[in-house]
Amino acid sequence: ANPIKVHGLILRTGLIQKLSNGNSIQVLFSPRLMTDFRNIDSRHFQFGGTFIYKKVYHKRLKIGYGILYNQETFGPNVVPLVNLEWKISERWSMSGLLPIYSKVKYKVNEKLNVGIHHFGLVTSYRLGEETYQNDYIERRSIDLGLFARYNIVGGIHIEGRYGYSFGRSYSQYNQDDKIDLALPLATIRDNRTQLNESSNFSNGAYAHVRLVY
């Protein structure tokens, strides 16, 4: 069979309400199209969002507490969140939406930042290809690596990343093979049967370059 190519398009919209004490409430709605772009129907769409209450501890430290919910193809996915903005010094800072992603950044000069980053989030993709039309793919990976971001002009940056992916898998399941609940370190009533056990991915290096605005 031909290789399966999956894609994700995510729209984020919502509101941020500033409070009188300087803290804020953020509510985001995040519909997703997670698909192989074959025979797309309503089952290729997912709906979810995040809620975060952000507290200002001082001008260099803001921490938000919240939750992410998304209705994945395999069932509901719930992730407790910690949103961090910490300016450690004039050159060092740390930011992220833990446990999904984070960055430790060093400011080399006004245009160049370098540092360490991580990204880890379970995602799922509905398949429309006729051979696999009743199946979905569940992707798992934790990416850890180095990055460099350069400001080209205005708010446009170019960023390069190089690192290593741990626990990488693209597991294939039947559309009716679901779980009751997914959490960051556990799944509730997960009795699924993987359909592609012979094609498991191994850990490995990754590298990519992207434009950021």
Where are these regions (language model features)?
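Residues that define the transmembrane beta-barrel architecture of outer-membrane proteins
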Residues: 3-9, 41-47, 76-80, 98, ...
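Flexible, surface-exposed loop regions and adjacent strand-edge segments
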Residues: 2-3, 43-47, 80-85, 131-135, ...
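Repeated loop/turn-to-beta-strand initiation elements of outer-membrane beta-barrel proteins
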Residues: 22-27, 59-64, 91-94, 111-114, ...
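Outer-membrane beta-barrel strand-turn architecture
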Residues: 17-21, 55-59, 88-90, 108-110, ...
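Outer-membrane beta-barrel proteins
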Residues: 1, 36-40, 74-77, 123-129, ...
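Outer-membrane beta-barrel "beta-signal"
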Residues: 81-85, 148, 154, 199-213
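Extracellular loop and loop/strand-boundary signature of outer-membrane beta-barrel proteins
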Residues: 1, 34-39, 68-70, 89, ...
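Transmembrane beta-strands of outer-membrane beta-barrel pores
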Residues: 31-37, 67-73, 88, 100, ...
